[in-house]
């Protein structure tokens, strides 16, 4: 099964995309693994890419390189491909999914993401209607409504301001 890294360059405080890509290529060459790379360009792009990839090529091991939002998009995009596997390299602000594992895991290890054993994980399926259009999606660690959504929206806005990044955006 091919491993495909989906990289969100806007995750966390901004990912050094070229450096990450170089490291992924270096590790995959060492492991003699054929990998794919996709750098997202906008919100929703990770979901769209994973879905289209599955429709064209079938199952893959997708590695979401970003935060919880990127991971959620990849899970939603690959949701109709039952043999797809999902991994994560945490680059986001909170990385709540990864922090929920007591042992910490090898989430930051590119080699472990390529060679690791997969295990099943429960997901949350949600359905909503927005502007008259139905949407079904999936998330892996939490689903928020109300106040939490307002905080997340305000945090995203704060992170766009100069000198405000990471956890500081949540405090403000």
Region spans (language model):
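ATP/NTP phosphate-donor binding region
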Residues: 1-62, 72, 76, 108-111
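Catalytic core of DAGKc-family lipid kinases
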Residues: 40, 80-172
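Short secondary-structure transition/capping motifs
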Residues: 38-39, 59, 63, 67, ...
């Amino acid at each position: 099964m091919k491993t495909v890294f989906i990289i969100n360059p806007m995750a966390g405080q901004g990912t050094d995309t070229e450096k990450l890509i170089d490291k992924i290529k270096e590790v995959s060459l060492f492991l003699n693994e054929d990998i794919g790379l996709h750098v997202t360009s906008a919100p929703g792009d990770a979901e769209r890419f994973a879905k289209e990839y599955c429709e064209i090529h079938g199952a893959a091991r997708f590695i979401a390189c970003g935060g919880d939002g990127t991971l959620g998009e990849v899970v939603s995009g690959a949701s109709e491909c039952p043999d797809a596997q999902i991994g994560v390299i945490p680059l986001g602000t909170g990385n709540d999914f990864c922090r929920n594992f007591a042992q910490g895991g090898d989430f930051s290890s590119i080699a472990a993401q390529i060679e690791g054993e997969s295990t099943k994980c429960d997901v949350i399926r949600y359905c909503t209607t927005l502007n008259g259009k139905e949407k079904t999606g999936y998330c892996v660690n939490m689903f928020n409504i109300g106040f939490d959504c307002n905080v997340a929206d305000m945090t995203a806005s704060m992170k766009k301001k100069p000198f405000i990044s990471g956890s500081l955006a949540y405090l403000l």
